Amino acid sequence: MNTLAFQTLRALADGAFHSGEDIAGGLGVTRSAVWYGIRDLNAAGLRVESVRGRGYRLDCPLSLLDAGRLREALGDRAHVFTIEIADRVDSTNSALLARAAQGAPGGLVLAAEQQLAGRGRRGRAWRSQIGHALTFSLLWRFARGARELAGLSLAVGIALARALRAAGAAEARLKWPNDVLLPSGKLAGILIEMHGDMLGPSAAVIGIGINVRADAAVSAAVDQTVADLETAAGVQVDRNRLLAALLRELHDVIGIVEAQGFAPLRAEWQSLHVYQDQPVSLQLPDGSALQGLACGVADDGALLLQTNGLVSRHHSGECSLRAAEAVK
């Protein structure tokens, strides 16, 4: 969407009726421009109701991202992060990787209402509707090299699960290496990309996408079942408060990883793993699969797979884990 459409969306975000005249006056544009903004919102899949004599309203209120409200919700952690909110970007991860290469400091957060080329793991596209998901990336700098941060993705999963459970998704579980699931489908995902030396100082761009509100178009466009936080919680979710809670949890687990590695978090991760001690199929990069029992993870985040009494270690790479009964 263009800038005018986003301005119009902010004017309507509360879900109340607003006259075209009031919207135009508030934005400093013509009534005709407002009409075009409404048209673009509808074209983007955001349903705007028009009633003669009352004006326009969204069919459901939206919690739009706001840097000021986010900093307020962060409280005593606000100084840790530099917050940037964008209407639209190609990819928050790509943007922060470029910023990392330019020397941007750690603690930089970029959240976007719309990603035009959002990315997930294994090259998959991340699809979301404007205002219905929480998509952001965090740049963090480490004195350690990337080789010593092998368990970072799993630590981030713990932070994500903690925040989502606190927000009402009590049944949120982790799936190795980077997904958060509910019984009804995938709730959130993680994509971590490294910049810097394998042995020396490094930077991680931690990308997270959360399905906050159900969206039929998004569900139809992806090849897996999708869950959402508002359905699980039974209430409308304030995305600014959710992001603040998640950033606080991320700050906590990153501090542990920096000081001690993933090992202190291993037991908690295993307690949240949806396939812990369950029969699974591990899909390997060459297309083959290993059947076995998911018996935990190692201190470096490697999956421990028991097959015929022997335990093997597998790092995430391009591997994919499924329940054994889901494999045909």
How should these model regions be labeled?
Residues D179:
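Conserved active-site carboxylates
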Residues D87, L174-W176:
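Short loop/edge segments at beta-strand edges and connector loops
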Residues H79, A104-G106, W176, G185, ...:
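Short, basic and Ser/Thr-rich N-terminal targeting/leader segments
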Residues M1-T30, Y36-R39, A43-A44, R144-A172, ...:
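Long, positively charged amphipathic alpha-helical accessory segments at protein N-termini or as interdomain linkers
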Residues N2-A166, V237:
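N-terminal lobe of the biotin/lipoate ligase/transferase fold
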